[in-house]
Curated annotation (Swiss-Prot):
<keyword id="KW-0997">Cell inner membrane</keyword>
<dbReference type="GO" id="GO:0048038">
    <property type="term" value="F:quinone binding"/>
</dbReference>
<keyword id="KW-0812">Transmembrane</keyword>
<keyword id="KW-1133">Transmembrane helix</keyword>
<keyword id="KW-1003">Cell membrane</keyword>
<keyword id="KW-1278">Translocase</keyword>
<dbReference type="GO" id="GO:0030964">
    <property type="term" value="C:NADH dehydrogenase complex"/>
</dbReference>
<feature type="transmembrane region" description="Helical">
    <location>
        <begin position="62"/>
        <end position="82"/>
    </location>
</feature>
<feature type="transmembrane region" description="Helical">
    <location>
        <begin position="30"/>
        <end position="50"/>
    </location>
</feature>
<comment type="function">
    <text>NDH-1 shuttles electrons from NADH, via FMN and iron-sulfur (Fe-S) centers, to quinones in the respiratory chain. The immediate electron acceptor for the enzyme in this species is believed to be ubiquinone. Couples the redox reaction to proton translocation (for every two electrons transferred, four hydrogen ions are translocated across the cytoplasmic membrane), and thus conserves the redox energy in a proton gradient.</text>
</comment>
<dbReference type="GO" id="GO:0050136">
    <property type="term" value="F:NADH:ubiquinone reductase (non-electrogenic) activity"/>
</dbReference>
<comment type="subunit">
    <text>NDH-1 is composed of 14 different subunits. Subunits NuoA, H, J, K, L, M, N constitute the membrane sector of the complex.</text>
</comment>
<protein>
    <recommendedName>
        <fullName>NADH-quinone oxidoreductase subunit K</fullName>
        <ecNumber>7.1.1.-</ecNumber>
    </recommendedName>
</protein>
<dbReference type="GO" id="GO:0042773">
    <property type="term" value="P:ATP synthesis coupled electron transport"/>
</dbReference>
<dbReference type="InterPro" id="IPR001133">
    <property type="entry name" value="NADH_UbQ_OxRdtase_chain4L/K"/>
</dbReference>
<keyword id="KW-0520">NAD</keyword>
<keyword id="KW-0874">Quinone</keyword>
Length: 102
């Protein structure tokens, strides 16, 4: 049995659903929301690479690498902001973060 496009799309759909479910279920913890967004981006990357291989085009793989780079930068900046916020407030929650002034 070979692994085809439908298998990759099913895995990506499951990861995307878990990511969206994580955002809706846990709205209090910013770190869980950040990890859920990363899961959604991973599902998008799996779709990009799967369709790129299926269609025989390299553009999807290049775009997936670009999305991975942006996701890594987003995670690094987000975690740096959260660490600074935790040091100042002592708590990381969405309610406290909405009161940030800048």
């Amino acid at each position: 049995m070979t692994i085809g496009l439908a298998h990759y799309l099913a895995v990506a759909a499951i990861l995307f659903t878990i990511g969206v479910f994580g955002i809706f279920v846990n709205r209090k913890n910013i770190i869980v929301i950040l990890m859920s967004i990363e899961l959604i981006l991973l599902a998008v990357n799996i779709n990009l690479v799967a369709f790129s291989v299926y269609l025989g085009d390299v553009v999807g793989q290049i775009f997936a690498m670009f999305v991975l780079t942006v996701a890594a930068a987003e995670a690094a900046v987000g975690l740096a902001i959260l660490v600074t916020f935790f040091r100042n407030r002592g708590d990381i929650s969405v309610d406290d973060a909405s009161m940030m002034k800048g």
